[in-house]
């Protein structure tokens, strides 16, 4: 399966308006994963922080997905807001990992500015409040199974911007 370069990072890192593979989709018959707890990203979404986000340069206020869970063949609307503690300059990176079951589909480092520019944001990203509303098309042919996605974002100086993860399982429609 070929992964587009919009939905996944947009879903995982929408406050930074990033974009990447659409692997976080599940069927409507599923029960959303339990994501309660201290590391839950606020809002209607499956996102969790990788660790305590208090030292991150990006403080995410909220991420809402519609529909949640995302549905194959339907547009996914992402609304997100957050505050950056300082300007995010060129040279910032995203380490993206996507696994499908036990198979690692993606393990690559990407330039953050290249990704933000794909969705209409200028780089460097200014210090202060950021608001994003983005719609991405979800392909109808999403293989059933368990997807685990991790996006670790760092500044050019190596400071943590954010680190997010999501686990989504969807089943074959019967």
Curated annotation (Swiss-Prot):
Protein name, UniProt field: Phosphatidylglycerol/phosphatidylinositol transfer protein
BP term (GO), one: intracellular sterol transport
Keyword match Repeat: no
Molecular function GO terms recorded: sterol binding
GO cellular-component term (any): Golgi apparatus
UniProt function note: Catalyzes the intermembrane transfer of phosphatidylglycerol and phosphatidylinositol.
Quaternary structure, from the entry: Monomer.
Gene3D superfamilies in the cross-refs: 2.60.40.770
Pfam families on file: E1_DerP2_DerF2 (PF02221)
Signal peptide: 1-19
Compartments where located: Cytoplasm; Cytoplasmic vesicle; Golgi apparatus; Secreted
Family indicated by similarity: Belongs to the NPC2 family.
CDD domains, per database record: PG-PI_TP (cd00917)
Main location: cytoplasm
Keyword line: Cytoplasm, Cytoplasmic vesicle, Golgi apparatus, Lipid transport, Secreted, Signal, Transport
Organism: Arthroderma benhamiae (strain ATCC MYA-4681 / CBS 112371)
Proregion positions: 20-36
